[in-house]
Curated annotation (Swiss-Prot):
Keyword annotations of the record: Iron, Metal-binding
UniProt KW Iron keyword: yes
CDD domains for the chain: Frataxin (cd00503)
Record's GO cellular component terms: cytosol
SMART domains (alphabetical): Frataxin_Cyay
Entries under InterPro entries matching the protein: CyaY (IPR047584), Frataxin/CyaY (IPR002908), Frataxin/CyaY_sf (IPR036524), Frataxin_CS (IPR020895)
HAMAP family, A to Z: CyaY (MF_00142)
Free-text function comment from the UniProt entry: Involved in iron-sulfur (Fe-S) cluster assembly. May act as a regulator of Fe-S biogenesis.
GO terms of molecular function: ferric iron binding; ferrous iron binding
Origin species: Vibrio campbellii (strain ATCC BAA-1116)
Protein name: Iron-sulfur cluster assembly protein CyaY
Pfam family, one: Frataxin_Cyay
Gene Ontology process terms (BP): iron-sulfur cluster assembly
Length: 104
């Protein structure tokens, strides 16, 4: 994968995260600045998701720690847990929000 393909794939994941948050109706604010997406919760806690172009990875930082995701079989997969990125984002959002979120 070249850098252009990497950015296109990450853009698609970021869009999926935004749409999932919007569709859920959860009280989560998000902002994208450059290569960084910040999710902010009612208690002001944050989840930071950023693209690491040199390694072709997506990194996620939350209350639970830091996680690195690589594209494996067309899925962004965590090197620590084996979870897919979108599943971990949803799980971490629920931890930060302190409640179950209806992801529809």
């Amino acid at each position: 994968m070249n850098d252009t393909e990497f950015h296109q794939l990450v853009d698609a994941q970021m869009q999926l995260i935004e749409e999932s948050i919007d569709d859920s109706g959860a009280d989560i604010d998000y902002e994208v600045t450059g290569n960084v997406m910040t999710l902010e919760f009612e208690d002001r806690s944050q989840i930071i998701i950023n693209r690491q172009e040199p390694m072709h990875e997506i990194w996620l930082a939350s209350k639970s720690g830091g996680f690195h995701f690589k594209l494996v079989d067309n899925k962004w997969t965590c090197s620590k847990t084996g979870m897919e990125l979108i599943a971990m984002v949803k799980e971490e959002c629920e931890k930060h929000a302190g409640e179950t979120i209806d992801w529809a």
